[in-house]
């Protein structure tokens, strides 16, 4: 297993390009199954989950054509099997997203129950109940979800999500795109990635309205056609590199991104003392060599502060002036990185869903282990400011969400290298 070795102390300075958003790319790839002709999706990040999704299509008999810029063309008409097998699904939760499109377009689907990150209990029952509301017959047996559309196809339905679910909203929205009649999704997720998926469905000739609000209305259409689409930038990658600049007292400009999808994070960075300038597709952060000030924050569904940026701000607070409280309201077990940061000398107390972080002047390099995707990013940030060397093990977690993290950080002046395990 690869490891990262980071020598702390370099002040980051420079410019980098932000990759496409994995959490938009995965549902958009799944939605290509709805089309009745070839679809091209561009700006895909080069990440394991994306390759797994493309491999899953290959397993179903679709042969995606990929160019060197990681643009992929998918022709769903060549599908041969409607089964998403366990060995691919187990490594990636998002494969549940093929369930809705397959039932809507082909009338049936068999999808293994998913695997993925070890955070909290992420149930798939909302996906199942939503499809049942549209008339699908569903059985869960032998670790597989087996779904069949009724005679004449799925029917539009009113569906209320009793908890806000991003993948649940996406799955039902995709199924509704080809259902007969109107579907109304209430208490829907409002994330920008949901909006990106809705824009993609509409680019294929769909009729989705209200994405980005908690009520989404979908008028089903007879067919969805070929389209060319570019995936939105990754707001979490954007935020992570901005925090990297902030913790090191540096200056970083991130390009090919969108400041409007990151407002809660930018506000907190300003509160921490950063100077921030933005353009249409870039953000520049300058700390002028200052140590950040500690901030209090509470994670909540979009447009509030994102849970996927929580760990990075614990790293910021760990070396900041003062004490900050971080309250996690989305996932349980999301402070696993704290115990690794203790090894580096961080002063963090966890009480239930709250982490109280008292900033120290300096962290010390130590061997640490990544436990999940965003936690691993926080260890990288802490290592950038720690005295001496930090060895981060199990970095396959990082590779699931960050494209070429060591190369991008090297471009900003970080002393970081990957070593084979």
Curated annotation (Swiss-Prot):
It comes from Pseudomonas putida (strain GB-1). Belongs to the EPSP synthase family. MurA subfamily. The modification 2-(S-cysteinyl)pyruvic acid O-phosphothioketal is found at residue 117. The lineage of its organism: Bacteria, Pseudomonadati, Pseudomonadota, Gammaproteobacteria, Pseudomonadales. SUPFAM superfamilies: EPT/RTPC-like (SSF55205). One of its GO terms (cellular component) is cytoplasm. It catalyses: phosphoenolpyruvate + UDP-N-acetyl-alpha-D-glucosamine = UDP-N-acetyl-3-O-(1-carboxyvinyl)-alpha-D-glucosamine + phosphate. Keywords: Cell cycle, Cell division, Cell shape, Cell wall biogenesis/degradation, Cytoplasm, Peptidoglycan synthesis, Pyruvate, Transferase. UDP-N-acetyl-alpha-D-glucosamine binds at residues 93, 122-126, 308, 330. Cell wall formation. Adds enolpyruvyl to UDP-N-acetylglucosamine. GO terms for molecular function: UDP-N-acetylglucosamine 1-carboxyvinyltransferase activity. Pfam families: EPSP_synthase. Pathway: Cell wall biogenesis; peptidoglycan biosynthesis. It is found in: Cytoplasm. This is UDP-N-acetylglucosamine 1-carboxyvinyltransferase. The gene is murA. PANTHER family: UDP-N-ACETYLGLUCOSAMINE 1-CARBOXYVINYLTRANSFERASE (PTHR43783:SF1). Its EC number is 2.5.1.7. The active site is at residue 117.
């Amino acid at each position: 297993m690869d490891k990262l070795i980071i020598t702390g102390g370099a002040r980051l300075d420079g410019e980098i390009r932000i990759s496409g958003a994995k959490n938009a790319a995965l549902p958009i790839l799944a939605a290509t199954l709805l089309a009745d002709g070839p679809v091209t999706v561009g700006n895909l990040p080069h990440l394991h989950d994306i390759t797994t999704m493309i491999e899953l299509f290959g397993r179903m008999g679709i042969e995606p054509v990929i160019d060197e810029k990681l643009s992929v063309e998918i022709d769903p008409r060549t599908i041969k099997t409607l089964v998403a097998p366990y060995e691919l699904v187990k490594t990636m939760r998002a494969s549940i997203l093929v369930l809705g499109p397959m039932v809507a377009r082909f009338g049936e689907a068999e999808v293994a129950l998913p695997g993925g990150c070890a955070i909290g209990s992420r149930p798939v029952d909302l996906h199942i109940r939503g499809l049942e509301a549209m008339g699908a017959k569903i059985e869960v047996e032998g670790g597989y979800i087996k779904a069949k559309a009724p005679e004449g196809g799925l029917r539009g339905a009113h569906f209320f999500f009793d908890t806000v679910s991003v993948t649940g909203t996406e799955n039902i929205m995709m199924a509704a795109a080809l259902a007969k009649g109107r579907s109304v999704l209430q208490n829907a997720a409002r994330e920008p990635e949901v909006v990106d998926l809705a824009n993609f469905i509409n680019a294929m000739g769909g009729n989705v309205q209200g994405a980005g609000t908690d009520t989404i209305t979908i008028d089903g259409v007879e067919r969805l056609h070929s389209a060319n689409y570019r995936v939105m930038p990754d707001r979490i990658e954007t935020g992570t590199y901005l925090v990297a600049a902030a913790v090191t007292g540096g200056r970083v400009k991130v390009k090919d991104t969108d400041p409007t999808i990151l407002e809660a994070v930018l506000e907190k960075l300003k509160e921490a003392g950063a100077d921030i300038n933005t353009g249409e597709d870039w953000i520049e952060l300058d700390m002028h060599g200052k140590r950040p000030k500690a901030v209090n924050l509470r994670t909540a569904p979009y447009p509030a502060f994102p849970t996927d940026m929580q760990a990075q701000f614990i790293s910021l607070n760990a070396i900041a002036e003062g004490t900050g409280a971080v309250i996690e309201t989305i996932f349980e077990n999301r402070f696993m990185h704290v115990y690794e940061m203790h090894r580096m000398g961080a002063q963090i107390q966890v009480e239930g869903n709250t982490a109280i972080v008292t900033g120290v002047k300096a962290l010390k390099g130590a061997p640490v282990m990544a436990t999940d995707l965003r936690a691993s990013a926080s260890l990288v940030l802490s290592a950038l400011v720690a005295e001496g060397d930090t060895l981060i093990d199990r970095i396959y977690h990082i590779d699931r969400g960050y494209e070429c993290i060591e190369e991008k950080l090297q471009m900003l002046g970080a002393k970081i290298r990957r070593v084979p395990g």
